[in-house]
């Protein structure tokens, strides 16, 4: 009997550790927070069960995870901007179409990946504090209205390896980098800074979905 109680207690602790604060709503089974920005932000990464979970890693323009993240297995790697358009990867606004947007493909409804401008808005209009959430390093990001989300430092995947988890965060946008056939926009952070950049499309990075 004591063993049963212990199991139940541990299960309750696990549920509490994954319970987010300040949730504003739910769409297609996934909760979001209104930070007072142009879009609403999911409380967790794509593929994660709670805010501090890393979630899944995606190459840019792919909607499923995989074992190896390299140039050969990434269909968008090496494609010019015009080629991305002609093959249907990006639409008229220059961002990934629904078919190739990992957030839309996996969560459905109106969920999608953030654009480069929306990521930069999150970066520049919010207050970022390096912290831990249930022993997971990352940033507490507070919006103009006082609401917040947690972004774990989930690292990234190259080939079969997970690198720099716990110290770096790497998040994709849906926007390709026009000056390179190999890169797309995302943002990167460590314990001291956060900035926008362009990164190899074949690398496995995390995604924080958004809603209009």
Q: Language-model features: where?
A:
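Positively charged n-region of N-terminal signal peptides that target proteins for export
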Residues: 1-4, 19-20
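Sec-dependent signal peptide hydrophobic core
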Residues: 5-10
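C-terminal motif of bacterial Sec signal peptides marking the signal peptidase cleavage site
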Residues: 14-17
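Conserved positions within compact, well-structured domain cores
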Residues: 21-212
């Amino acid at each position: 009997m004591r063993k049963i109680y212990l199991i139940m207690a541990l299960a309750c602790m696990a549920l509490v550790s994954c319970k987010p604060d300040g949730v504003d709503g739910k769409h297609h089974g996934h909760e979001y927070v209104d930070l007072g920005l142009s879009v609403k932000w999911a409380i967790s990464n794509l593929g994660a069960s709670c805010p501090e979970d890393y979630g899944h890693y995606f190459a840019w323009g792919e909607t499923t995870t995989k074992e190896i993240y390299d140039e050969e297995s990434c269909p968008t790697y090496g494609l010019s901007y015009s080629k991305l358009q002609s093959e249907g990867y990006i639409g008229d606004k220059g961002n990934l179409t629904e078919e190739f947007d990992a957030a839309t493909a996996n969560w459905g409804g109106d969920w999608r990946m953030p654009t480069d401008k929306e990521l930069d808005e999150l970066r520049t209009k919010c207050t970022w504090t390096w912290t831990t959430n249930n022993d997971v390093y990352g940033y507490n990001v507070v919006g103009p209205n006082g609401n917040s989300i947690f972004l774990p430092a989930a690292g990234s995947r190259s080939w079969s390896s997970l690198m720099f988890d716990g110290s770096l965060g790497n998040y994709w946008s849906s926007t390709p980098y026009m000056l390179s056939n190999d890169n797309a926009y995302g943002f990167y952070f460590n314990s001291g800074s956060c900035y926008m950049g362009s990164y190899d499309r074949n690398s496995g990075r995390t995604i924080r979905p958004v809603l209009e």
